[in-house]
Amino acid sequence: MRFAAPLLLIVAAAPLAGCGAAHDPALNEQQAAAAQNRAPDRDKVMADRWSGIFTNPAAVVAAANDFGFKAEGYRASGKGYAATGKVTWPEKPNGIAVESVFEATGPAADRIETVRFTFDVKHDAKPGERARDSYGYVRRIVLGFLSRFEVGPGDTINGALQRRESAKDVQHGVSIVVDANPISGGNAKDRHITVTFTRVGASAPANQTQGK
């Protein structure tokens, strides 16, 4: 009988421990749903995934480098932190060249507030037969980057990327802006396209391009 009291304490404490785990703020929505034995809230799951872009600089740099940007890392720069990289597609000229710059900026080593891709899409006077295959580079890079975090840009932004037009939208706490303009003095089809992802509520300095 002398073991009865401790046994009762253990049994009584078990439900409390379970409740504590279910409400642990360190858990994401999928983990919390599993702990509470319920279906996850899709909006919260997507918000968690988008948040991962801004709370994991190493993963962001790795995702950009998957597409050849060769960013060296998220490092102290000016009044904050930044990672940058450049790449040109395709490797062999075929009537079109896509010069691209990747930038991630933020106020701290563990936090990003803005991710930006800039594309200069330039055409020869008479693009080759393979040039049409290169028109989709901008969209493929942006969607490919986002897919690393299991998110997508939504129909509005996806359509703008397909048409190389300007647009803006907000997805799960993230502002997405596509700014597409002709390149002065270039071919009529040439475009300067900037795709910017900003955490809603980001501070002004993090929204500015480093070094400008």
Positions of PLM-derived features:
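Short, low-complexity, Pro/Ser/Thr/Gly-rich segments in the mature regions of secreted, periplasmic
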Residues: 190-212
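Post-signal peptide N-terminal segment of mature Sec-exported envelope proteins
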Residues: 27-52
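Short, non-transmembrane alpha-helical segments in secretory-pathway proteins
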Residues: 47-68, 137-156
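A cross-family detector of function-defining hotspots
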Residues: 65-108, 147-185
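Bacterial N-terminal signal peptides that target proteins for export
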Residues: 1-8
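Bacterial signal peptide processing site
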Residues: 19-22
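Long, charged/polar, surface-exposed segments that mediate recognition or autoinhibition
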Residues: 100-162
